[in-house]
């Protein structure tokens, strides 16, 4: 008993010296950390570190959905499509501007239509698979919106290629570049659940309208580049034809963009409690709408009656679309920053 009492005295003296030197807290912290590490090692050895708790709210995926997801993961839809579309667009462009344009032959136009339709159907199949697996429309992040925009581009090209042969070339090129950006960019192709605020049909409608307007504005931009090339080759008839097409496409593109912004404001009021917050994405979308709206004022701004100035203006205006979609997502941030995830 005497030795035990003497030991207690020494312990008290030791702790008093540590307390006076300010090292007691550090020692206690080190002892606590060591104890935690020993406990973690023991739990790892016993297999009791992680004990999953069953979530009654999570439903098991059906066998069909599992098979569909396995199939979707085995087929690199974006990679296949952007390679085929870019190659097809370049070849068709060379055929269009060759000394003997092959688009004059009906058989070549039919082959082009079949290739365009095949690419569109393959893309549609991929989007249907993704929709079936996720249980929602694939328009919730940057990767999915780029996929949807490429699909819209192909649909527009299919509808217009029989009247304007260049639309097939532009459809392949524009959709190919869109899918290329989606594939090599820092976008997340994984199928993930939506956060509650994004689970809204208004959001899907808002995104689909905005992407549709961007697709039309992309066609207008390529029309402008082609018109300048034809102007340098002194082919006035082709310039006038492309100018007419751009003016026709500008009306639905601007109207759809305005509707998309309006529906986005309605959704924002439901989700965030306000229609307009001057978020960077909102500001740049409004700038895009106003700049493209200037091109309608041919009576008050007479310089827009000149085809070449009209096309140059629309080519320059497309930079606002790029800034709205890419610049804001990756550089400015804001409430729409989830779009690049």
Annotate each language-model stretch with its function.
Residues 51-77, 125-146, 187-211, 264-281, ...:
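Membrane-interface interhelical loops and short amphipathic "cap" helices
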Residues 170-175, 236-259, 308-322:
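Interfacial and helix-entry/exit segments of alpha-helical transmembrane bundles
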Residues 98-105, 129-136, 160, 164, ...:
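Juxtamembrane transmembrane-helix termini
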Residues 1-13:
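Single conserved hydrophobic/aromatic residue that forms the stacking wall/gate
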Residues 280-326:
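C-terminal structured "cap/appendage" subdomains that terminate the fold
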Residues 61-176, 185, 189-192:
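Core alpha-helical transmembrane segments of integral membrane proteins
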Residues 88-92, 147-162, 208-227, 285-299:
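Hydrophobic cores of alpha-helical transmembrane segments in multi-pass inner/ER membrane proteins
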């Amino acid at each position: 008993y005497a030795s035990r009492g003497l030991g207690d005295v020494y312990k008290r003296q030791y702790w008093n010296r540590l307390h006076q030197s300010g090292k007691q807290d550090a020692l206690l912290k080190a002892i606590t950390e060591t104890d935690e590490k020993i406990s973690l090692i023991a739990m790892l050895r016993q297999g009791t570190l992680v004990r999953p708790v069953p979530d009654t709210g999570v439903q098991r995926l059906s066998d069909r959905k599992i098979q569909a997801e396995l199939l979707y993961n085995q087929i690199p839809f974006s990679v296949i499509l952007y390679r085929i579309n870019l190659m097809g667009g370049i070849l068709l462009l060379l055929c269009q501007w060759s000394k003997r344009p092959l688009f004059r032959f009906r058989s070549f136009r039919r082959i082009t239509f079949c290739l365009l339709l095949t690419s569109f159907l393959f893309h549609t199949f991929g989007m249907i698979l993704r929709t079936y697996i996720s249980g929602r429309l694939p328009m919730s992040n940057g990767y999915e919106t780029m996929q949807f925009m490429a699909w819209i581009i192909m649909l527009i090209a299919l509808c217009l290629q029989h009247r304007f042969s260049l639309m097939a070339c532009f459809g392949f090129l524009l959709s190919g570049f869109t899918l290329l950006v989606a594939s090599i960019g820092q976008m997340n192709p994984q199928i993930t659940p939506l956060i509650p605020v994004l689970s809204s049909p208004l959001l899907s409608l808002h995104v689909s309208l905005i992407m549709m307007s961007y697709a039309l504005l992309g066609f207008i931009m390529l029309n402008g580049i082609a018109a300048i090339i034809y102007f340098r080759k002194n082919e006035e008839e082709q310039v006038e034809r492309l100018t007419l097409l751009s003016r026709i496409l500008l009306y639905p593109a601007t109207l759809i963009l305005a509707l998309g912004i309006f529906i986005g404001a309605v959704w924002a009021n439901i989700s965030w409690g306000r229609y307009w917050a001057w978020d960077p994405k909102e500001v740049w979308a409004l700038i895009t709408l106003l700049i493209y709206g200037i091109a309608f004022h041919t009576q008050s701004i007479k310089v827009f009656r000149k085809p070449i100035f009209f096309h140059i203006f629309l080519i320059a205006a497309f930079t606002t679309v790029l800034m709205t979609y890419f610049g804001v997502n990756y550089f400015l941030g804001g409430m729409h920053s989830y779009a690049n995830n």
